[in-house]
């Protein structure tokens, strides 16, 4: 059970924007994909193009149904051409694992669900680099956006990627459960503020990031959700949902996501009607 807030959503939101915040994101899923056909398999099941990847780099993408709607949005990281790490949304762990497994028939790939064995923390904010550098044995300035490294926090082994869900600079870290409390406390001691799911949601909304079940879902396509840049032609590769998505990308859709800017005080709730 993840806390919605530790102190207040506003304070935690502002702490991430002005200094640094720490999020426990251990509820998210983590899979390991291994085998000689991993890249071929992911090219078939993802809408983004893995030819744009390289070892030590991650990529944001979606898995889609044949009708183009979204199974899940996620990030995967290429450790080597036969080994990928994948981070998926918490609500979709079982569904994603089953979806991946159901499409393995023709591919030499093994999928391991590490979700319950590993913990995850997001360390986000303008001071994230500076504060984290004193704790790790790698030069963080050499880890560019969406790249990752294996290193240690005070002798505890971690996987660290320059990714995030706040719109700020920062990192997402994965490690064995046994190190969780020590790593969390080490990060807190840098002066960063713990932040809950409420601030995580307000920060991602401010940064215009999609959340599964809201801006994207099994009834919304990436093109409708403003993610048409993820839909790649991948010449010669017939990936799941390609026909529908490429048509939507070229011809447009009947509906699309838009942002609203309030001119007066108020809160726009999900499913509110728009009258004009």
Which residues make up each language-model segment?
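Charged, low-complexity, helix/coiled-coil-prone segments
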Residues: 32-47, 71-79, 122-133, 188
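A generic structural motif
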Residues: 34, 64-66, 263, 275
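Membrane-targeting and insertion segments and their boundary/processing signals
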Residues: 12-16, 67-70, 74, 106, ...
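Acidic, proline/glycine-enriched N-terminal capping motif
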Residues: 1-61, 69-71, 198
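Well-ordered mid-protein domain cores that form the structural environment of catalytic cofactors
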Residues: 49-103
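Conserved, structured C-terminal
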Residues: 1-4, 10, 79-276
